[in-house]
From Swiss-Prot:
The keyword GTP-binding applies. Residues 1-159 form the Obg domain. The keyword Transferase does not apply. Gene3D superfamilies: GTP1/OBG domain (2.70.210.12), P-loop containing nucleotide triphosphate hydrolases (3.40.50.300). This is GTPase Obg. It is found in: Cytoplasm. Mg(2+) binds at S173, T193. Monomer.
Amino acid sequence: MHFLDQAKIFIRSGQGGPGAVSFRREKYVEYGGPDGGDGGKGGDIIFEAVTGLNTLIDFRYAQHFKAQRGHGGAGKNRTGAGGNDLVIKVPVGTQVLDDDRETVLLDLTEAGQREILLRGGDGGRGNASYKTSTNRAPRQHGPGWPGEEMYVWLRLKLLADAGLVGLPNAGKSTFINQITNTKAKVGDYAFTTLRPQLGVVRHRNREFVLADIPGLIEGAADGAGIGDRFLGHIERCRVLIHLIDIHSDVDPVEAMHIVEGELEAYGAGLDEKPRLVALNKIDLVDKELVKAFQDELLEGGADRVFPISGATGKGMDALLDAVLEYLPAATVTERPTGEVEEAEDQKPWSPI
């Protein structure tokens, strides 16, 4: 499935139905007069967060969403039926932003969460409501109030408990393959990972979701590389794992400061999140060098440093034990039975 984390769509709520112009004329029935009913209310635009989806790709092809108009009123003071609401289904973690791409209108973080963004217009008044002591047979009626419309941006921020950051080619794909059920692409070149990856980690009878984003380079916050665009996907993480390649040409302390500088430049509180520094690829160097770099990182500002090997799995248990310290009682995947996603039906996916 192709990954898309931003999409622009047009939405319009339904217009209210027109009021009716009707008069009661029945044989042997006294007191006739106007009996036109009011029009029905237009349909609302509703966003619903659903499980089982982690891309906005469907909104590349369906970009206009309009709720149904309310039905017209009828004689005998019958109110028209309301228009059907339009429910737009989006992945959990989706934000709905105004056309300026900055103002957050909705933030859908829970499965099943429903929010009304645009309300349908009220129905127009029927002629019965215009009757007065001086106007016994009014013929005017309300056409129905118009609905609301606007362009909005959808932005997906994946829900993960822990985030994985580092320079390109730091070994993040190998690392996430080692500890999760994900099979990320691995290559001996920078930017092997071109889009965020999610994997479920199971450790000591716990499980949590780990997000891997494309590598960061110096100046990413100013548009260099590709990693800055995806930093939003780790905004919701409780802890970050900073992977540093001990076998790289870049000094580990310098690598740490580059990534920390980009997190601070991006903002959104990323630089304030707890970070666990993982010194990766220790299977390629001797123990003395590992100890020396570990000490340098601690002196350079790291709170905790974990020597690991993504290829062999060495040191992983200690690192994952530390991650568990920052997790809530129930992570993204640890939910009561009643909240677990229901079995998939056979209907093809549609955003409405």
